[in-house]
Each structure stands twice: as structure tokens, then as C-alpha cells.
Amino acid sequence: MAGNKKQVKKNTKPIVVDIDDKPLLDTSNLDTAVQTSASTKKDGKKVTATTTTTTPTPTPTPTPTPTTTTTTEKKSKEIEIVPTPSNVPASISASTSNVVIAPAVEAQITDDFSVVPEKNKNKKKINSTATDGTTTTTNIPKPTPVRAPITKKGNTAPRSQFHLLALDEDDITFDETHSHKEEPKQPQQQHSTKKSSSKQQATQNVSSSSSSKKSKSKETKKVEPTPTTTTQRTTTTKSTPTPTPTPTPAATKVVEQPKEKSSPAPVKKEKEIKQNKKESEGFLFSLMESLITPGVPSVVYKIIYVALIGVLLFSLVPLYYSGLDSIYSYGVIALVLGLGISLTLFISEIPRLQASKEQKSKSGNKKSTTRKVKA
């Protein structure tokens, strides 16, 4: 059986260990490649098994010494191997009885605290039934990282995973953001409630004012007396005893007011105009009026006017040749011109003078008739 032994690397030392059932260590984050080989007693000869571990050296951290742990039961032929996240396949060789396993060395934990997976989550069991010189190799897939969910302060359940960014700071910022969003709503709600209350008060005031106005108008209508006197006057003046419908007070006012007010106004105006004219006419007007006789046409007065003007003009010629002083001649000429102007005024006012003369004559006749009737 000496020819069946495998060559062992220089840096590895075989150790024989009796394995008991103990809890496994969590080495799921370690990048390792495991190669194990076991030999059993056959035909009374003892065969030793060697284990080799190869670890990649990460650049940012010092050289870690990751470990691999394998457990087997004495009576069973199963070997349980913890999967590693590396892409390097692990070769496993097993025999039937004794297994030699490398000691468990605590690996140095890397600085990547972003994700910490749960304990004993990605473990797999591999059954290997190897004969004397045969080995079974299995390619272990890379486990997917599990992210811890962000929990609020109120949750009291124990955390199996944690994230550095998912601590109380996130909870504080979460609460602060919610508080900041909720705070500006309160003044808006108060403002809206104030607006609604002010609108309700305004509508109530308007309704109360309108109702008060309506009540006042109704009271005034009830208090106002009905104009019964006007209806009685209209009924008494009529000779027929037929009942007449009572007219509304508005209609009676419209009919009566213009008659009472319109009648004295034009009379006063006419009297004022006549008085003003008499004052302006003066003495000359009274003289011209005295010259007119009623019933004489105006054509006669015009003919007389033309004749008088002609006489005055011809009378100036002998004055010019008589040799009188210039002072006298100018005086005579002024008299002639004055007479001519007065005659023209008289002719222009003839129709007016005739009308006034006729009115006076009629009024005189009326007075005389009234005196005779009284006598």
C-alpha cells in the first residue's frame, strides 16, 4: 500500500484528529479553495491523508490565513464541506474510515462591512462514495450576497443581519424627513379652516342683512296709509253712480301732479316778460302807441313814413343855399336826421304796437260790460 500514497507539498503537515459533532464555524465570506484527501486502513495497514489549502492574497489587506473546516462522522461515509465564495473549485478525496483534517485557523476578516450574510445559510452537503484510489470533485457555485432590509425604530424584532448605513441614523433621517413634510401642512390646514370660517361668517352676515332689509320693507309697507281721499274725490265728481275701480295711488299722483304744477308756471313767466318789456319800452313806446288808432292797416303808416322822410331831405337843400352860419345849418341837419330815425323805429314797431293797442281796447270793453252788468 506504500505505492498508493500521494505526494504532499512541503508546506503542509498531516495531523490525525478524532472529530466529534460540534457546531460549524461561519466561514462563508472567506475566499478559499479546499483540497482534501483521505486514506483508510486496508488489510491492516494505515494510510495517512493530507489536506492542502490555497488562499488568494487580497491587495488592500494584509495576508489573511483563511481556513476550511470539514466534518465527518466515524461510522458514516459523508463529508460536509462549507462552500466558499471563490471561483476556485475544491477537490475532495474521501475513504471509508479515518479522515485527516487540517486544524481550524481563524481567518482575518476583511474590511468590507457592507454585507454580512446570515449564519449557516449557504451550506451544502456533499455525499462522496470513493473507493480506494478514486476521488470525487465538485464545483461549488458562488453564493449571492444578501442585503439586510432597512427597519424603522418601532420594530423590536432581533436583527439577524445589519448594514452600517441601516442604523439609527437612517431612522432619524427618515423620521426627520417625515416630520418636515408634515409640519407645513398644519398652517395650511389652519389657514384653510380660517378661510372657510370667514366665508361662512360673510354669508351669514349677508343673509342676515338681506332678511333685515326685507323685514323693514314689509313693515314700512304695512305702516304706510292707503290714500283713500283721492279715490273719494274722483267718485264724488262723477255724476254716474256706477262703482269705479279704486285706482292705485301711483296712478293718481301721476295724473294730479302735472296739472297743479304746470298751470302756474307759464302764467308767472308771461307776467315777468311783460313787465320787463314795459320797463324797457319807456316813454317813446307809449308815444308811438298813442299815435296808432285801432283798425287802421299798417300800410297807411308806411306811406306816411316815406312821405315825411322825403320832405325832410328836400328841406335841407334851401338851408344849404340860404347862407346861414354853419352852426345853425348843422343843428337843422341833426333835427332832420333825428326825425328820420324816430320814424323808422315807429314803422318797425307798428305790428307790435297794434297788438298791444287791441288788447288794451278789449280789456277796456270787458271792464265796461262788467260795470254795466253790476249796475
From Swiss-Prot:
Residues 1-12, 363-375 have a biased composition (Basic residues). GO terms for cellular component: endoplasmic reticulum membrane. It is a multi-pass membrane protein. Residues 26-39 have a biased composition (Polar residues). It comes from the Eukaryota. Its main location: membrane. GO terms for biological process: vacuolar proton-transporting V-type ATPase complex assembly. The chain crosses the membrane at residues 299-319, 327-347. It is found in: Membrane. Keywords: Membrane, Transmembrane, Transmembrane helix. Residues 129-141, 198-212, 225-241 have a biased composition (Low complexity). Residues 175-185, 256-274 have a biased composition (Basic and acidic residues). Residues 1-76, 119-274, 355-375 are annotated as: Disordered. PANTHER family: V-TYPE ATPASE ASSEMBLY FACTOR PKR1. This is Uncharacterized transmembrane protein DDB_G0282483. The lineage of its organism: Eukaryota, Amoebozoa, Evosea, Eumycetozoa, Dictyostelia.
